[in-house]
Amino acid sequence: PKFQTGLNNMESVVLNKMDKYTINVDGVIQHGGGYYMYTTTASKISQVDEKMASMFSEVSTYMDENGIEKSGNPFVLYNEWNENSGNVIFSAGIFTPSEVITPAASEILTGFLPNQKVLKTTLKGDYKNLKEAWDTAYNYIEANDLEIAEDTKNFEVHLTSPENVANPAKWITHLYIPVK
């Protein structure tokens, strides 16, 4: 019984450490933008986390198979977000140093993110805390009288992933909201 109690206590400590997270609003910066390869889907908001991993893999595999250089970390571009319906249209992409022309039938496309002023927020922790991180960023915008640039889209860059960092408390995601 004492051994089992000890194991249960140890498990509790480990799980608590894995649940730790921090959200930091880094401030307004200039994001350099650039070309990227991507694929897009529509889904329920609750499915973004599970879908993005396979989409990143699909884009990465396409780039590897076609000898296309990667520059930077995978990112998610939110094309449309509808809280009322619970639906989202998003793209999963990987930056590349130059424009790539893809065949007409390709599921993987090329896009360009402009150099733009953005509010940068950093989440260190599990993706389940992303909503709180986005809410924190929007609250900062409101509290500091910043104006959202409506003609561009929010995006998040994943510096780490579950594939290469097992502990969710160590995952790092940068959130970017374009501002004027």
Stretches found by the model and what they are:
Residues P1-K180:
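A solvent-exposed interaction/effector surface
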